[in-house]
A protein has these predicted regions:
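Conserved interdomain hinge at the start of the Helicase C-terminal
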Residues: 126-128
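Active-site-proximal helices and loops of the catalytic beta/alpha 8
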Residues: 1-80, 132, 149-180
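Aromatic/acidic polysaccharide-binding cleft in carbohydrate-active enzymes
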Residues: 29, 79-111, 130-172
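Short, solvent-exposed helix-loop connector elements
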Residues: 116-117
């Protein structure tokens, strides 16, 4: 892909998806390789801090400083709100899903329960998470639907169809707030 883009005088930014230590993730970033990776280590620490009331912000601060120590202040790592392998942030923030349930159980939950957002505070939590991701070093990456609070448990429930219209008031409000953060 990069060779073709170089011949045409264009640059293609390539970001990877690797779970593991900072060293493992960094090993795929180099000239002729990936430009960046999703920062899952930061995401996995940010998720409970923003989704729950009980988590300590120091945990997030430590994870952010570890990310900066490994990738530098001016890096291209992806600050994600979620991805296709994880349940949706808003379903954690809503309290529908918890952090104690085994990861593979979320797949069954997605098939057997109608996961919807019940707690409107979850939209505010997601807005704060967006603001955090857009103001720290790296590139903010919003998983489709997270701009308005699409719920979901495990795969395939977290891959619901994107809604482009007829959003609920609180979904439209979050979408507008997210749009404001971007512009």
């Amino acid at each position: 892909v990069k060779l073709i883009s170089q011949k045409k005088g264009k640059y293609i930014y390539q970001i990877g998806e690797t779970y593991g230590s900072h060293d493992l993730i960094k090993s795929y970033i180099n000239s002729g390789m990936l430009d960046a990776q999703f920062d899952f280590n930061l995401y996995d620490n940010a998720l409970p801090v923003f989704a729950l009331k009980s988590e300590d912000m120091r945990r997030l601060g430590d994870a952010l400083m570890s990310s900066i120590a490994n990738y530098g202040y001016h890096h291209l790592m992806g600050n994600i709100t979620g991805n296709q392998d994880k349940p949706r942030f808003i379903s954690y923030a809503d309290g529908t899903l918890d952090f104690e349930t085994p990861w593979m159980e979320y797949k069954r939950i997605g098939w057997t329960q109608d996961i919807q957002v019940q707690d409107t505070l979850a939209y505010k939590k997601l807005a704060l998470f967006h603001a955090f991701n857009m103001t720290i070093p790296g590139i903010p990456i919003i998983y489709y639907g997270d701009e308005y609070g699409l719920p979901g448990a495990g795969d395939p429930d977290n891959r619901r169809m994107m809604q482009f219209e007829n959003l609920k008031d609180r979904e439209e409000s979050l979408r507008q707030e997210t749009k404001g953060l971007i512009t």
